């Protein structure tokens, strides 16, 4: 036990005395949160819109006003011709063009044409659906106004609308904030980076400078060497979890709907998976550079691409969906979203927890087996 | 297994892929001996150390340390030996004292417990104990590494090229320290590429390209040198080397610091003097005026050069 504590102290000396490590450990969570929170946002804001209004009546004017007033859109120009709109699309001045047919107000179900720049398909889908929502809301309101008018004059021949109007209620994230999605993702990313990358680099560094040789030729059991190398990073990742949660709660207004204890417990489980992956990498790589490269390619890319953090897994080809199952971050992100955003209890995430626990067991067995008690 | 032998090696082979790192090495190192492995880079010294410190498995052959098998009893061996690898294997970002404390705890001991053993060495670096190990000079690093390897009072000490990259004064000091450790009853196996350090060992093994060429005391090895050895000096040494090699009576000639060491084909004492006078005339004819030729005692390096592997 004294051996172990002394080893731990040594590990903390290494971490605290290396400015670069400290920078990665402390600054990265803050940078990532701020970057994702403010710079890299998938939310729609101030999209430039042009309008070709061929009826110029009371109805179209009110719709145009509403579009312009919404925070999603900014009215760029009211056009005189269709060609003008095409030119603006080509110049990249506008992302959406609304075309009202002649005599729009007098025909109750006249179509409005929406033209969107679909170079970014996701954005185009979002823009058009937002615009559609604004228009149909206006239509609904007018309908109810008209119904009210007809109701006041009995015997009037006002027609009741037979259309079905969906009432949309967004669960868990009513404001559709991007932060709700990326905070769990950033947590998955940072824990993976700190636990896996730092642990693997830390162990490989001892191999590289030759101290591993001395440690191996000592009575210290290899399992203690592994544990002592991994433990500090588990502790530091806890600090990071708390930093991220605090930042997202106070800075980005992401609520913590579920139990904080449960959230931290899953995070520790996930950190363990990452630590074991780091150990596994350290048994393969012989130089710090190789360890870093393997960590980046084998761990970071899947976390970014296959975890559902950036791209929805449901939209991927079947083989990638299947592959995403072995990405620990996928399960972690699902569990964190369930607990943090939806406020679900432990019973709802048993599947994710057992997948992660299974991964820990398999990885520990494999990496302890692979850890060499000798040099080759 | 002989009890008075601390280290036994018999028929050890080790290959790295196609490279034969060690070929049929058999050695017995006695208890309390200061034993030197002498040979250039690539001789297989480090591989041999790693097999004995249980870091590598031999491909074939048997090896034991303190009567314990290096493969089967690796755990117990690791408890009993001290190892200082060839590279400077300390934590550069830890201070002198932190390094020593760390290695003491790893070996389940404290600095105080075995301070008497390392005092002579550690006292020289103690004034710098709050300095980071990475900021020490080569000689001080080496003293710290030795202190760390000794802190748990090992029965056997393995030192892999401890004097490489260390200044000549520190090297002499280092060997003095090893002498004192030997008096404490510690068996020491040390390797070095410097032939001049060989004479400080009780016995040495000359190694080259994975083979053990000869094992004996330094004096014993020197006595096997049968030919007359001449040191030849002149103002233009480079031209002299070529001319000496071109001399028909020359057996071998190598540049050794300030003189060329020359051996002759003629081995009988009677014949030698006539060959030497023949050499003087040969050199005079070549235009040398300041040549000095003297008979010298062979060094270990001369013996090593003479032990060319039979191709």
Model-assigned labels for residue ranges:
Chain B
Residues 78, 119, 222, 304-305:
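Conserved protein kinase catalytic domain
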Residues 176-265:
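ABC transporter nucleotide-binding domain
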Residues 226-311:
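Short, charged/small-residue-rich alpha-helical element at the C-terminal edge
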Residues 1-13, 310-311:
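ABC-family P-loop ATPase nucleotide-binding domain
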Residues 72, 113, 216, 239, ...:
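Residues that form or flank phosphate/diphosphate-binding pockets in enzymes
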Residues 7, 14-207, 214:
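ABC transporter nucleotide-binding domains
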